[in-house]
């Protein structure tokens, strides 16, 4: 008999290529996920709160000399071109609502 319970999930924001969602795990913990294209980054609640607190700063980011934007999550750096960055910012704006 399989007693495995699937987490309850809720989409928090979504664009054409990016998505943010929350999972309420069977053990009572809440985790958050940020899917950026093919990459999915998971966050514990405290880390998610840090991301939300940094939205204003992320909106002010400038591209480097190659026209690329970078965002760092714990041990992961994600580089985006102008089009992807604009979509990422839209996702962040939707999360602020």
PLM regions and their residue ranges:
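Positively charged, low-complexity terminal tracts
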Residues: 1-97
């Amino acid at each position: 008999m399989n007693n495995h319970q699937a987490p309850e999930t809720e989409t928090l924001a979504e664009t054409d290529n990016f998505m943010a969602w929350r999972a309420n795990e069977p053990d009572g913990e809440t985790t958050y996920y940020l899917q950026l294209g093919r990459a999915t980054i998971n966050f514990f609640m405290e880390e998610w709160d840090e991301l939300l607190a940094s939205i204003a700063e992320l909106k002010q980011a400038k591209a480097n000399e190659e026209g690329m934007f970078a965002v760092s999550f714990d041990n992961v750096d994600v580089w985006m071109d102008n089009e992807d960055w604009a979509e990422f910012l839209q996702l962040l704006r939707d999360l602020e609502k």
